[in-house]
Amino acid sequence: MDMKKLIERINFLYKKSKEEGLTKEEKVEQQKLRREYTDIIKGNVKVQLEGVEKIPTPNRKN
């Protein structure tokens, strides 16, 4: 599932839970989608951090 559809479905289930409640199946789906979303975000952060290089700075005299 692409990120936009994933977020739309998560938001839909959240709004439905506040308005009328969720079935057991929808609660399970909501948990699964939230886990999938956080796993994607964690993976993106990991990739970004792996690409970071420390740049040495010259010693400065004050």
From Swiss-Prot:
Stored Gene3D superfamilies: Helix hairpin bin
Claim: Cytoplasm is one of the keywords in the record: yes
Q: Where are the transmembrane segments?
A: none
Q: What InterPro entries does this protein's entry cite? A: DUF896 (IPR009242)
Top-level taxon of origin: Bacteria
Coiled-coil-forming residues are none
Q: Where in the cell is it found?
A: Cytoplasm
Q: Which family does it belong to?
A: Belongs to the UPF0291 family.
Record protein name field: UPF0291 protein CBO2609/CLC_2481
